[in-house]
Design a protein with these regions (language model features):
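Bacterial Sec-dependent N-terminal signal peptides
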Residues: 1-27
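Patatin-like phospholipase
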Residues: 21-63, 71-388
Length: 389
């Protein structure tokens, strides 16, 4: 089964009973997942429990890792499927690099990864990168997982309507992403300042939503949620004795607004799954995914009675279907457009990517072409998007 498209490459607590609602109208149930880096994997047991109880939220709102986990859930992945992804993912590779040796050009192989610092050349000047981590592998990982819904551009059209939080770092504003590609929303929401590059968006730059609103319960409330299930892994402000190094001080400063807002956000939840006291690893410990998920079960079990009660009271209402939409396993491009690339590099990239119009490709074949383009060593990142024509 084939479909045709345009490929663009861009180089750059307590529970409120339902008896308080009208009995003939299903209450709007929202699921809100906070950011927290690797600790966000602790959200997954809640999703598995919702599945087992037959509770399908009417809205999912997430920030940072909560956007990744919540976005997958909103597009139709089950809690068990997301847990399987978390266990099998090569997190060191996803979070730690951009190009494999096999994709590097012959001319570059002798120099590959020989140096601790790479300098880029832009506008005739040498420049250091603006992040600690090359996010090419992360982008590829996200794009692969969200491929089944690449044709969905209004997040209300996902199996579960979805919103992602980000921060406009230029103007100091919250940004609620409600359209575009799900892969872009995930990547923007997880842009931890200094760790990952900021993401260009319209006339500004986006970074992690946690800078201003790590636990965006108020977004769900403003969208008319009657019942809010909140899952918080974000943590609290560190005491003076824990602010013992530059990184801890910088992280606390960057999250200060979210920390101050967190009590208000928690108070808006009807069911609050508080993971913070139960998590023993840090935001960067992705390799501890199994432990994170096991620890996530503790907070869920503490709210089991409230979740079961919600399930019982929702049984008289129809639940929305929750599965990944059907999608074609191959794509045929009508046109391939290269943006953000000089004419001098265009021929090289076209030859290396070796992707052509009117030829069917699997997702893996598209990814391989992108990796080969990245392997020229000319670019810090290569992004791609599929557009309907």
């Amino acid at each position: 089964m084939l479909w045709r498209a345009l490929l663009c490459l861009l180089f750059l607590g307590c529970f409120a009973p339902l008896s308080s609602f009208a009995q003939d109208k299903k209450p709007k149930v929202a699921l809100v997942l906070s950011g927290g880096g690797a600790k966000g994997l602790a959200h997954i047991p809640l999703l598995q429990t919702l599945d087992s109880l037959g509770i399908v939220p009417d809205l999912v709102v997430g920030n940072s890792m909560g956007t990744m986990v919540g976005g997958l859930y909103a597009m139709g992945y089950s809690g068990d499927s997301i847990a399987k992804i978390a266990r099998s993912a090569d997190w060191d590779n996803i979070m730690g690099g951009g190009t494999g040796l096999n994709d590097v050009t012959v001319e570059e192989k002798s120099e590959f990864n020989r140096y601790m610092v790479n300098l880029g050349l832009k506008d005739g000047k040498f420049r250091l990168g603006n992040s600690l981590i090359n996010d090419q592998n992360l982008r590829t990982f996200i794009s692969s997982l969200t491929f089944p819904v690449h044709k969905v551009h209004d997040f209300d059209d996902l199996p579960i309507p979805f919103r992602a939080m980000a921060t406009d770092i230029v103007n100091g504003k919250e940004v609620i992403l409600e359209s575009g590609t799900l892969a872009f929303a995930m990547r923007a929401s997880i842009s931890i300042p200094g760790i990952f590059t900021a993401v260009p968006y319209q006339e500004t730059l986006l970074v992690d939503g946690g800078v201003l609103n790590n636990f965006p319960v108020d977004v769900a409330k403003a969208m008319g949620a009657d019942i809010i299930i909140g899952s918080d892994v974000g943590g609290n402000m560190l005491p003076k004795e824990k602010l013992e190094n530059l990184s801890s001080i910088m992280f606390q400063a960057g999250m200060l607004n979210s920390y101050l807002k967190n009590p208000e956000s928690r108070a808006l939840c009807d069911i609050l799954v508080d993971h913070v006291p139960n998590l023993t690893y840090s935001t960067s410990d992705f390799v501890k995914s199994e432990t994170m998920m096991q620890e996530g079960k503790i907070g869920v079990s503490q709210n089991n009675d409230a979740l079961v009660a919600l399930s019982e009271q929702l049984k008289r209402f129809d639940q929305r279907p929750h599965k990944i939409p059907d999608y074609a396993d191959k794509v045929t491009f009508d046109t391939i457009v290269f943006n953000g690339i000089s004419k001098g590099n265009s021929t090289l990239v076209r030859e290396r990517a070796n992707l052509k119009p009117d030829t069917p490709y699997t997702l893996d074949e598209v990814k391989s072409g992108i990796a080969r383009a990245m392997g020229t060593g000319r670019f810090s990142q290569v992004n791609y998007a599929l557009q309907n024509t």
